[in-house]
Amino acid sequence: LEQIEGENRYATPEEQQILSQYVGWGGLADAFDESKSNWSAEYHQLKELLSPEEYRMARESTLNAHYTSPVIIRQMYETLEKMGFSKGNVLEPSMGIGNFFGMMPDSMKESRLYGVELDSITGRIAKQLYPQADVQIKGFEKTDYPNDFFDVAIGNVPFGQYKVADKQYDKNNF
């Protein structure tokens, strides 16, 4: 990823194939724990390879970086088709590397794609995999999308006891 970005270009199809295999940090919490001696090599390698900000974001994402099964994604799109959706502005609000974009059926390919991803590495991979999409790497609450802009929001956002500040909606205590 760093080489591709350093050369200021988009990934080739072969590089996209490699990048698409990235599954996030969700299963690697032990690799971020200095006290886990059997993960010591991985811990030190991550500290060496990632910038301090990348490391912090990757470590924070270990609790919620789990990707959705293709079976579930296909079913969600089948449901959208049955509801009559064929094209429009599509939002993936917690996109990971964009598996929902990648599995979008041909019948919806004329849609305009918008994605948001909090983790820097994951979001940068998504940008390489879907250069035609508008991918923002930040918390969704920090985006400036207008209300009523999206025709469909699809994805599998993290579940948990998270509360974020959003000036527009804080008064409702969402």
Q: Where in the sequence are the language-model features?
A:
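Class I S-adenosyl-L-methionine
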Residues: 1-129
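SAM-dependent methyltransferase catalytic-core segment centered on the flexible catalytic loop
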Residues: 94-174
